Amino acid sequence: MKHIVKNIHFVGIGGAGMSGIAEVLLNLGYKVSGSDVGNNAATRRLASLGATVMHGHDAANVSGANAVVVSTAVSGDNPEVLAARSQRIPVVPRAVMLAELMRLKQGVAIAGTHGKTTTTSLVASVLAEGGLDPTFVIGGRLNSAGANARLGTGDFIVAEADESDASFLNLFPVIEVITNIDADHMDTYGHDFARLKQAFIEFTQRLPFYGIAVLCVDDPNVREILPFVSKPVVRYGFAEDAQIRAVDARAVDGQMHFTVLRQLNGHTEPPLEIVLNLPGLHNVQNALAAIAIATELEVPDAAIVKALREFHGVGRRFQRYGEVATPDGAGTFTLVDDYGHHPVEMAATLAAARGAFPERRLVLAFQPHRFTRTRDCFEDFVKVLGTVDALLLSEVYAAGEAPIVAADGRALTRALRVAGKVEPVFVEQMEEMPQAILNAVRPGDVVVTMGAGSIGGVPGQLVSHQQALQGSQA
């Protein structure tokens, strides 16, 4: 590719999926430019690495580009996309560019409705500890690396495979993981769940004859597609027929302790005693996927154990901000932030919080993400939001969608009041959320901020507020 394409421009370069690919291309020696309406940590990092980052979209930004990369979040009438097409500059979907990177190495693609980012991070961390020095492209910041992408010298590239727009069907990896299959992004599949499952079956057909599909058989929908997967399979989970199986899982001080039984290629491997530096049974499953891949690639057991014990987590995936003082100075509350925005993953995260912090009041500040998701999962949202002890609920983060009156934040608030499990506090503007949290907390509470939108900035504001308070008292 490099002898033809030297200058690559990204429309929406600050996005989680785009910035990682841009960073790897920078490290490969390409000249990278990009535009974004916002200025975030990803754009600042890319600029520091040598990318030309422009704020706002303008037709002039694509001047000199040999290719323009876009995500599905970028509309077809974007001025940069229109300019590229008029100048016959190739407009390349993000997944197609990721597929090009995968052609340079052996691809490990992590798919599934929930858990992709954490599982990708765990796989990358275990392979790195095993000396395989993988390249990785992750949808969140891997805390140990300080970035969501890295160019390694090894044979493997580990990346998330996105089913939301069916773009994962562009990838041709040698190892695939499917963590679970759930009803999300159903507009892509004509609101037909059978079509979504068929897409995952087609994803496994992208594997070569020597490839491996690593499947979580705890998930009933993954189990349903199992008979239709024609490539070699490694089953993982808590289920008795899992080849990579966790037993005796228990929560200890915010970590998960468990034993892994392994049956691969007709051989019984020695059991592994694992301490995972993450809470929750769902993260045990995510770790099992990493263990399955590492075992297949003959990573030493000691490296697997060490990587999972010392895993530093991923930004906005049960990210702990520590203790924050209550406004009255009578004590502190524990602050945790999470990207969860679908009822299934929210339930898993809240269960993990209960396990990590037993017998403590759980306060959730939640920003729904997309009106269509809120509409499609409305009753499930009401159910999961009703499990917390106190709830602050904001308006839906639109993500470019038009409002749906019966599926907005106020509609959710009314439904929760009718259900009677929790009395929600509706917070109209996200700027008001930090103060609303401070008004609601008591000493000893666990506060979880959750959502895929602008609520991600709230924990930093709470920490800054505390630091300013401490400075004024010094």
From Swiss-Prot:
User: Do the record's keywords include Nucleotide-binding?
Assistant: yes
Q: Where in the cell is it found?
A: Cytoplasm
In terms of SUPFAM superfamilies, this protein maps to: MurCD N-terminal domain, MurD-like peptide ligases, catalytic domain, MurD-like peptide ligases, peptide-binding domain
The EC category is ligase
Keyword Repeat listed? The answer is no
Q: Where does ATP bind?
A: G112, T113, H114, G115, K116, T117, T118
Q: Which reaction does it catalyse?
A: UDP-N-acetyl-alpha-D-muramate + L-alanine + ATP = UDP-N-acetyl-alpha-D-muramoyl-L-alanine + ADP + phosphate + H(+)
The UniProt keywords, alphabetically, are:
ATP-binding, Cell cycle, Cell division, Cell shape, Cell wall biogenesis/degradation, Cytoplasm, Ligase, Nucleotide-binding, Peptidoglycan synthesis
A single Gene Ontology CC annotation of this entry is:
cytoplasm
Query: Where does the protein principally reside?
Result: cytoplasm
Gene Ontology process terms (BP): cell division; cell wall organization; peptidoglycan biosynthetic process; regulation of cell shape
Q: Which GO terms describe its molecular function?
A: ATP binding; UDP-N-acetylmuramate-L-alanine ligase activity
* EC number per UniProt: 6.3.2.8
> Pfam families from the xrefs?
Mur_ligase, Mur_ligase_C, Mur_ligase_M
* Pathway participation: Cell wall biogenesis; peptidoglycan biosynthesis
Highest taxon, organism lineage: Bacteria
Function statement: Cell wall formation.
The family classification in the record reads:
Belongs to the MurCDEF family.
Name the UniProt record assigns to this protein: UDP-N-acetylmuramate--L-alanine ligase
Q: Which organism is it from?
A: Cupriavidus taiwanensis (strain DSM 17343 / BCRC 17206 / CCUG 44338 / CIP 107171 / LMG 19424 / R1)
